[in-house]
Structure formats: structure tokens, C-alpha cells
Amino acid sequence: KGDASIPIDGLIWMVSIDEMKDRVRQKMQDGFTVLKFKIGALDFQSEYELLSQVRKEFGAALEIRVDANGAFEEKNVKGVLAKLDAINVHSIEQPVRPGQRKLMREICQETSVPIALDEELIGIHLIEDKVEVLESIRPQYIILKPSLHGGLVGTLEWISLAKEMGIGWWITSALESSIGLEVIARMA
């Protein structure tokens, strides 16, 4: 058995402040230094206050990522991103619904919070379509789920394109079985 490991992030769902702090403490005791918070389920001001308190208590030792699952709209997304920037959030996954490429490109260019495409990539299998989505949006990151991106070959195509375009990427799962998780781990 080797000493090498694959870094993973811990997932925190939005709940009460005390419960969230307990979960964050537990994750940090378990060795996590990167936590992803699901946002967009509550009103954003409440979520922002929760994230602000977590940032205040845990400081720079904790890398905060957020996943919005397309929860925000053109009228509020820039304000949301400005607030997330104020608390030094690492990145936000899919801030607006898929299919809004012009808006997504605009926020990728204008915000200092890096944008990660997630749901935007699902169902895109042809290489020319992959090139088109990445060139039209120019995200800072892409999130890859092999079971949703054509398996190993489709995922490796996304990785190759991302590298060519200077786009960061990471691999995650979409409720895979233990066999699927092993394949993802071997890819990482």
C-alpha cells in the first residue's frame, strides 16, 4: 500500500449556522482543506451570511467552493459573484442555467470569482461541439463526470481540450457504484 492519495473535497449542504459549523469542523478534523457548499436552495442573503461566518471562523486554512446548479439569473448573478468575491470563494460551479452561453461568457470575463461549467457540458459528445462551447464561454474551469460525458474517451477529450485552451478541470462523480468510483480514481 502506497502513501499517495487523491485529494478530494468535502460537501456541505446549506443548513443552520450551528449545524454547518459543526459539519465544517468535522470535515476539517477529517483532514479536508477544501469544502464545496451547495447554494441556491435558500435565499442568497442567508447563504451568504452562513458562508461569511464560516470564512470568519475558519479563515484562509479553508478553501471554499460553491455549487449553484444554475440557481441564479441575469438580474442577480453579478451581485452574487461580488459578494462571493468579498469572502474569497475559490470558484462557483454553474452559476446560471445551462444554455445561456452569452451570459455565462460575460460573467466569466467580468468576475474575479472563477466560473466552473458543470451542467453546461452534459449531453455534448461531438468534439466540434465541445470546442464550440469552450471557445464561446471561455470558463476558468470545467467539472467532469465520466458517466455523463461519454465515459473515459469523452472525458479525456474534454481534458485534452481544456489543457489546449488553458482551462482548469477536475473530475467528480455522479452517484457511481464502487466500480465507477474506482474508474474515476484511476483516471485522477
Predicted features and spans:
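Catalytic domains of carbohydrate-active enzymes, especially glycoside hydrolases
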Residues: 26-38
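Short, surface-exposed amphipathic charged segments that create phosphate/polyanion-binding patches used
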Residues: 23-27, 185
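Short amphipathic alpha-helical segments
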Residues: 4-6, 33, 62, 140
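Active-site glycine-rich loop that binds ribose-phosphate moieties when present
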Residues: 18-22, 49-50
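Active-site mouth loops of central-metabolism enzymes
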Residues: 4-19, 39, 67-74, 116-118
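Metal- or metallocofactor-binding catalytic centers and their adjacent structured scaffolds
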Residues: 1
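Catalytic core of soluble alpha/beta enzymes
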Residues: 42-182, 186
